[in-house]
UniProtKB/Swiss-Prot annotation:
Name by which UniProt lists this protein: Non-structural protein 1
Disulfide cysteine pairs (residue numbers): none
Annotated region described as Important for cytoskeleton localization, given as residue ranges: 82-176
Pfam families registered for this protein in UniProt: Rota_NS53
Motif pLxIS motif mapped to chain: 483-486
Source species: Rotavirus A (isolate RVA/Equine/United Kingdom/H2/1976/G3P4[12])
Stretch list, region Interaction with host IRF3: 318-491
Entry GO CC: host cell cytoplasm; host cytoskeleton
Region of interest called Zinc-binding domain, as start-end residue ranges on this chain: 42-79
The UniProt record lists the keyword RNA-binding: yes
Domain notes: The integrity of the zinc-binding domain in NSP1 is important for degradation of host IRF3. The pLxIS motif targets host IRF3 for degradation; however phosphorylation of NSP1 pLxIS motif is not required for its activity.
Family per similarity comment: Belongs to the rotavirus NSP1 family.
Length: 491
């Protein structure tokens, strides 16, 4: 196991390029970070171990030792992990770049074998050519990749992933790209590669190659918001932002093939870029549909529908002494926009319900309560219209001129009054509402701070480093609300 890690350790002394590219955290002396009890393959050193969350993309794909390097496959710095990363579609030309990379960094010839013999002959027990001391020579060239399937794109990180483990909690899946290249041609490349090995190691090399190169591809899995860590989220002005670390180089390549051509024909340029690259910290907003869905789901569980039957004049989130309506604790760590939306939505439903029914205390048990929870749970789904129709029917609508309408005459606060006027585009609010107006008001309240249809599915931390730099120049990394707050007392 951990053949790739061992190869990185021993081959790093071969050339100057290897010394820079093969310096991975798993071979360092740094103290490991706390485990998150997720077992899988570290995409940097390829060993099967306990993983932790990457500081660059917030996904669990790096081991407790490699995390010290703070490298991510989304970096722009041409380190080893970046060189093994390709975006879809995968072509034969890209796979040839992977093969050439392995052949350049991990060659097997008589010179290399003799070099390793000299470095390991320290005692008599090391004279034999066995797997224990020469594991670095047993690295076959395979075309397996850890695949991250984002909403808009798919990223392949190639490596030698040995062993098996449950992938249920992993954000990636292992895919075998051998058939995209050429199965027989890859076999020939590995047979020629192992010819220089001693006979005792050739059989072990062949077993490793065929065992890993013939594994079937796993079914790809879409990455969801729940796959991202919350450890790098910070709360500021009751908004959440995510800390992202990226390694940035002065030069960017348009395609992965251009990067590999530079490595092949001008390795000194790669060495220069590696020595001048810098690490940058970005503070990106965390507004995305995945987080909104999670917050809405939590709000549906925590909400107190009894408020719509009450005579409380305070906003729904400020009730603290009523045991049927108290939800104040639920907004301790929740975004301020969720609290604002909750207050307006509950106040509007309360006004409609009190205008059309005979209830006057929050302790009463009403059949409308489960539907109010469903409004939050279905707010980002296609079932929202059906749920709002059910909610409207609970208001005891009457038919006037073949149209169902409800009364709307209870007192509401000024901010909600102005907001409803803006949604309906009216100068004066009507005293009756039809079903379409009722649905438009609720959807307008929910979409007040962010339009669900225009939100990205996943956080900004999955974007490439180049994209983050462009968004930073445009001022789109931070939330607009943050930009309105000044640290100066004079502003």
């Amino acid at each position: 196991m951990a053949t790739f890690k061992d190869a990185c350790f021993h081959y790093r002394k071969i050339t100057k390029l290897n010394r820079e590219l093969l310096r991975i955290g798993a071979n360092s002396v740094w103290t490991s970070v706390q485990s998150n009890k997720i077992k899988g393959w570290c995409v940097e050193c390829c060993q099967l171990t306990e993983l932790t969350y990457c500081s660059g993309c917030s996904l669990a794909h790096v081991c407790q030792l490699c995390i010290t390097n703070k490298r991510c496959f989304l970096d722009s710095q041409p380190h080893l992990l970046k060189l093994r990363t390709f975006e879809s579609p995968i072509t034969k030309e890209k796979l040839q770049c992977v093969i050439n990379l392995y052949d350049k960094l991990f060659p097997i010839n008589n010179t290399i074998i003799n070099k390793f013999k000299k470095s390991t002959r320290q005692r008599k027990c090391r004279n034999g050519l066995n797997e224990t001391w020469y594991n670095q020579l047993l690295l076959p060239i395979t075309l397996n990749a850890a695949v991250f399937k984002f909403k808009t794109r798919t990223v392949y990180v190639f490596g030698f992933y040995e062993g098996s483990v449950s992938v249920e909690n992993l954000p990636y899946r292992i895919i075998n790209c051998i058939d995209i290249y050429d199965r027989l041609l890859l076999d020939q490349i590995n047979f020629e590669r192992m010819n220089s090995l001693p006979v005792s190691l050739q059989s072990i090399y062949a077993q490793k190659y065929f065992r890993v190169s013939r594994i079937p591809s796993m079914k790809l899995r879409q990455i969801y918001y729940s796959d991202f860590t919350k450890q790098n989220l910070i709360t500021k002005y009751r908004t959440k932002s995510r800390i992202v670390h990226r390694n940035i180089s002065k030069i960017n390549w348009n395609t992965e093939i251009e990067l590999h051509n530079t490595l092949t024909h001008n390795k000194n340029k790669i060495l220069e870029i590696l020595s001048t690259s810098i690490e940058r910290q970005f503070l990106v907003h965390d507004i995305n549909l995945g987080r909104v869905k999670a917050d809405m789901f939590e709000l549906g569980h925590q909400c107190k529908p009894n408020y719509v039957s009450s005579n409380h004049w305070q906003p729904a989130s400020k009730i603290s002494v009523c045991k049927w309506c108290n939800i104040k604790y639920a907004f301790k760590d929740m975004d301020w926009r969720m609290e604002s939306m909750y207050n307006e939505l509950m106040s509007f439903i309360q006004a409609c319900y009190k205008s059309n029914t005979n209830v006057d205390h929050c302790s009463s048990i009403e059949s409308i309560y489960p539907i109010i929870r469903n409004v939050y749970w279905h707010s980002t789904t296609n079932y929202i219209d059906e749920t709002l129709n059910k909610l409207f029917s609970m208001m005891n609508p009457v038919c006037i001129d073949s149209q169902s309408v409800i009364n709307f005459h209870c007192q509401i606060d000024l901010s909600l009054y102005l907001h409803i006027k803006m949604i309906l585009e009216m100068e004066v609010l009507p005293f009756i509402l039809n079903v379409n107006q009722f649905k438009d008001i609720i959807k307008g309240i929910m979409n007040q701070w962010c339009n669900f249809s225009k939100l990205s599915e996943l956080p900004l931390c999955i974007e490439s480093t180049t994209t983050l730099l462009e968004l930073e120049k445009q001022g789109k990394l931070s939330e607009e609300y943050d930009l309105l707050i000044s640290d100066s007392d004079d502003d």
